[in-house]
Amino acid sequence: MTAREEPATTFARRHIGPSSRDIAAMLETVGAKSLAALMNEALPPSIRQAAPLDLGQGLSEGLSETEALAHMQSLAAQNQAFTSLIGQGYSGTILPAVIQRNILENPAWYTAYTPYQPEISQGRLEALFNFQTMICDLTGLDVANASLLDEATAVAEAMALAERASSVKTKAFFVDHEVHPQTLAVLRTRAEPLGWTLVTGDPLRDLDKADVFGAVLQYPGTSGVVRDLRPAISTLKAKGGLAVVAADLLALTLLASPGVLGADIAVGSAQRFGVPMGYGGPHAAYMAVRDTLKRLLPGRIVGLSVDSRGAPAYRLALQTREQHIRREKATSNICTAQVLLAVISSMYAVYHGPEGLAQIARTVHRRTATLAAGLTRLGFAPLNDAAFDTLTVSVGDRQNEIAGRALSQGINLRINADHTLGIALDELTTPEIVEAVWRTFGAAFSYADVEAHAPDLLPADLGRRTAYLTHPVFHAHRSETELLRYMRKLSDRDLALDRAMIPLGSCTMKLNATTEMIPLTWPAFAGLHPFAPCEQAEGYYALFEEFEQWLIDITGYDAISLQPNSGAQGEYAGLLAIRGYHAARGDSHRTVCLIPSSAHGTNPASANMAGMEVVVVACDARGDVDVDDLRAKAAQHADRLAAIMITYPSTHGVFEERIREICDIVHSHGGQVYLDGANMNAQVGLSRPGDYGADVSHLNLHKTFCIPHGGGGPGMGPIGVKAHLASFLPGHPATDGATPPAVGAVSAAPFGSASILTISYIYVLMMGGEGLTRATEVAILNANYVAQRLDPHFPVLYRNVKGRVAHECIIDPRALKAETGVTVDDIAKRLIDYGFHAPTMSFPVPGTLMIEPTESESKAELDRFCDAMIAIRREIAEIEAGRWSVEASPLRHAPHTVHDIADDTWSRPYSRAQGCFPAGTSRLDKYWCPVGRVDNAYGDRNLVCSCPPMEDYAQAAE
């Protein structure tokens, strides 16, 4: 790889919004002589890195987009996308081109944020509602969430739910010996810090002897076996335990649902519904539960409510369950999930409909049955009589020989430890592939000849007898024209980065450049099975190695793990590393975690999951950690102090001056420093956590390193650690050697959502060290510019001793609420009329707005946002002056819709134009919100989380 000869990288100039002329004007506005001078005022000198960011290999200036894509092609060429019949929870699938082009590759979908503002999120909320409906129908359960991270972590979440819901007081959980190995590994990791015991065995034989609060049963099993689980579930429930069934969605189109079998909870992966394997992810997992458990569900739930006119409107329901509300009382830290992938899987079901899904399943099963018949002729009868798509055969000492023959034909089989081979078929399996497998076992058969006499392998008494996907949405869009228009209609309802800036504080909604997204769907990256032989993924390993080194250079840490597939999972993995370190030193009693009151909600939730006791540290009037309170609590808990979790710069939008002192205090009492990297966009190239006292951090690649938010996922949260914690990074059964790791797996795949690492990799590749540093400087400039412009109208709550903010700022309208009744919610909804997504509301300070503009937004867009906020302040002044009451004001009626402007009557004290086209907005390019203000309380009182079946429509018609 060689750098460009030009003095400046073209891509960095395109990524960074303000031009040089804009930067000069903005510096004048904020009263700084230069970017360097502003950085000296915003950052404490004690944390500044001594040398410019050096990424090595001539990458100071980065590559051009053309050169970067050529380099990515060279990496892709080192991968080998063999036909993988490994199974183990991952399947080949066909992503319909219309969905790939119009969702996966469409910035209207992939640049959106989590739909906390429902009025501007109706499109993806409907798509997620469809996902939940699909899951409820296929699993036969009442309520589903809007995705989890992967199947293994979904099972771990189900275990936690079962423990919380069960009346049984034991701390043991039963694990079916047929669960996937990666699931067992993640369960072990999750159970150990909480003091839970795993009991592994055959549920049909061993459950009656087990005293457990719940059990997970794989359906079909990892070996492919299809078992009637009803006796085991009945035994479990008679003893007060909860039944978790980990189910294959495609199999459920032909098999009796978990609900019919008696399950309380169903979990699994939606990967084979159109999402490429991607060497491990990202994929949407799912969880569905009986109605009585709905308030214990982790993650997001989309519900149906009404808007201000009584029209149906979607929203996120039951949010008081979630980690950002429950904090240290949470049993799950799920934050970012896999929304974009859930949308793709739901559209796959819309595309195929129930008949199409069943036909795919029947074809897969028929080819599996035919394969089994041929193997039986060869003397390799499958070990299980009943199967859906996976066979396990005993091959004795011929395992390597047969697997080697398969490899020579470009086919991966699953090599098991007990002299067996696993063969899993999928949507991509052709008769020719089946014939090739037979050849590896020593004979050539004609597929047609064998198929004509092959018996089916599905048990008749487990056949599906209940309907699914009966709602019209799964029947009305069968032509590409109709489906294309449906997806376009939904995307038009939403406001994403392709329309306007999204100034969400602590979320870093920056540009996800098109070039960064291109390699993602290349077959050489998308088509690899995560457990394929390492030699087939040399391009991936080269990417991992180089990207890890870049993160080491950026952070000052000594080792990196790419496994955590969300920021919250990164927190969890980092705390497990600290826990493992203390245990290895004989300090297992160190379980106290100090957390400032301003912390992200995931911090206390992650600490709770890691078996730690949360002790809250106060913040002072400036928003900084109260160092005196920290010192007192560190001393009070010195014998048991495990760690502090601190976000830097703080969630108050300021670089705290005493961060080194904070680290020193914790270290002096035997604790470790976990520095939350959510705000790393303010540090890259300027300061390195590993240099000023932190021991471990996670990095949100979906923030700082340009993976798009996808409407609520995917994300990645790799962790960096200092050398003394390196041996406590997450392990994985697919990559561990003979010696078990000190800390187990936290994700289903060894490198998490590996395929989207290509996005962050190419971003760094094109930005180079200079570009990344410049991006950080401009992000800080943009935040200070917004703070300067808005402060006369909405006071900026926190600044450092030199009057500067970091990369975000908090504005405080609470006095206006006290005087006029205008709430932060009113301001947020009124911003929609101006064409903007609201800033972060009421975090970390209730009643305030936190704004993060990022480096990607131009001065023109920043000015448009500031002008909108100032115009809203003038509207509030009308209320102050008594010309409007707050109830009759455009703020309380916001957002305004086409129904407002088209209404035959208008009795409000402001004009239609004032309401619908407020000052400075364009009538030509107006974003029309599809619904009025959504009634959140109504939605929780009248919870509806899936589409009603067709018989409900028929009954309503009667």
From Swiss-Prot:
Per the UniProt entry, the Enzyme Commission number(s) are: 1.4.4.2
Which reactions is this enzyme annotated as catalysing?
A: N(6)-[(R)-lipoyl]-L-lysyl-[glycine-cleavage complex H protein] + glycine + H(+) = N(6)-[(R)-S(8)-aminomethyldihydrolipoyl]-L-lysyl-[glycine-cleavage complex H protein] + CO2
Q: Which Pfam families match?
A: GcvP2_C, GDC-P
Q: Which UniProt keywords apply?
A: Oxidoreductase, Pyridoxal phosphate
Annotated GO biological process: glycine decarboxylation via glycine cleavage system
Its required cofactor(s), as named, are: pyridoxal 5'-phosphate
What's the domain of life for this entry?
A: Bacteria
Give me the Gene Ontology terms describing cellular component. Answer: cytosol; glycine cleavage complex
Q: Does the keyword Cytoplasm apply?
A: no
A Gene Ontology molecular function term of the record: glycine dehydrogenase (decarboxylating) activity
Q: Oxidoreductase: is it a keyword of this entry?
A: yes
EC supergroup of this enzyme:
oxidoreductase
- On this chain, the residues bearing N6-(pyridoxal phosphate)lysine are K703
**Subunit structure, briefly?**
The glycine cleavage system is composed of four proteins: P, T, L and H.
What is the recorded function of this protein according to its Swiss-Prot or TrEMBL entry? The glycine cleavage system catalyzes the degradation of glycine. The P protein binds the alpha-amino group of glycine through its pyridoxal phosphate cofactor; CO(2) is released and the remaining methylamine moiety is then transferred to the lipoamide cofactor of the H protein.
Instruction: List, alphabetically, the HAMAP family matched.
Output: GcvP (MF_00711)
Q: Which family does it belong to?
A: Belongs to the GcvP family.
Q: What is this protein called?
A: Glycine dehydrogenase (decarboxylating)
